[in-house]
Structure formats: structure tokens, C-alpha cells
Amino acid sequence: MTGSSPASPLGEAELEYLRSQRIGRLATVGPGGQPHVMPVMYQLTDDGSLEFDADGIKLRNLTAEPRVAIVVDTMGPRRGVAVQGVASVVAPERARLRPRRAFSWGLRPGS
């Protein structure tokens, strides 16, 4: 896939889809390795990162373990993007996910 930067795993179809949506489900890892999934509103940045509010449990978890994932999808027609990466706090109660891996479905003809 070609993305917005040389290291980005997001192709143009994924970027276009992420720009068209606003809500995803963010997965963080809590103490003891317990997964925690919460809906978040996100914003796609110019470099292909995703910014979102991070407070409470999300902030605690990603500060201790920055590896996170987000899924953005729709059900009719079924399509979506799953992104795995590393999150960092960029402002008070604001974090940025830098994608390392991405998977998509239903975004291209025949997929």
C-alpha cells in the first residue's frame, strides 16, 4: 500500500475511508494485560496519524503501554480499517496514534 508518508501502512483507499468517518473503537492494554476497548472520536492528521481524546483509563493505559489499535468500520456495505500502532500523548488529554500496520476490507472492488 502507498500511504501519505514513506513509512505509512495506509493506502489512499484507507485514508479516504478514515477521512469519511469520525468514530472508531480504540483498544488499549490495561494493567496485567487486560484489553480495554472504548469508542473514540478521532481526527486524521496530514501525516496519516490519528488523534483522539485520551483521558481516564485510556490515558493511564496508553501511558503505561503505548501499543494500541483502532477499528473504524461500517456495516452496510461492510467495510472498514483496522490500524495497529504506537500512541503518544501530544497535549493534555490528547493522544496521537502513529500507524505501524493496517488492514482493510470492502474498500476496493472485489474485496
Enumerate the language-model features and the residues they cover:
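C-terminal edge-of-domain segments
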Residues: 1-7, 91-111
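Short beta-strand segments
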Residues: 22-54, 70-72, 82
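Hydrophobic small-molecule pocket/channel-lining residues, especially in calycin-type beta-barrels
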Residues: 2-3, 12, 27, 69-82, ...
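Short, structured beta-strand-loop surface elements
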Residues: 55-103
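Short alpha-helical scaffold segments that flank and stabilize functional sites
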Residues: 17, 31, 88-90
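A short, compositionally biased
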Residues: 19-23, 64-66
